[in-house]
Amino acid sequence: MKTYSQLKDTAQTRKDKKMTENAKKMLAEIQYPALQGTQDEVELAEKIRKAFIDYYMKKIDSHKAESYVDDQKKYASRCKKEARDVAEMKATIENFDEAALWIRYTGKQCFVERYSWDTVAQKEIDWKFFDLGDHIADYVQDGMSKEKVKKELRAIGML
């Protein structure tokens, strides 16, 4: 016969699993706008998108193992926040497709070429690349020309 503590642990495990599944489902349902560009550009943008989603999926899984997420409410809100972060990222970088194409344009495919997606999803993330994407997205929203963007990126040491 199981003790109260064992039964409680079993119930907790079921709740953890369900919440992780729900968070992943939310991630999977995020709708992205259709991509435009050459086939190479579209493939690159898709790879970048996939890397973001894979990274967040892994991040959700890893939270279960982290000791500071003992409180179930914190864990639940954390999972929801991760899914929300991806949705917000998609919203703030509506121009991320364009940013990805510009990364290709400026020859900054090193991220795609140097890192396997498994490595990216685990921990070896090239944050400089993500910063570059953010900077480009900001510049695109400000309506800068490609030449001006390249000049700005060189000035801050991104190119």
Functional labels for PLM-detected ranges:
Residues 1-159:
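Charged, low-complexity intrinsically disordered segments and flexible loops
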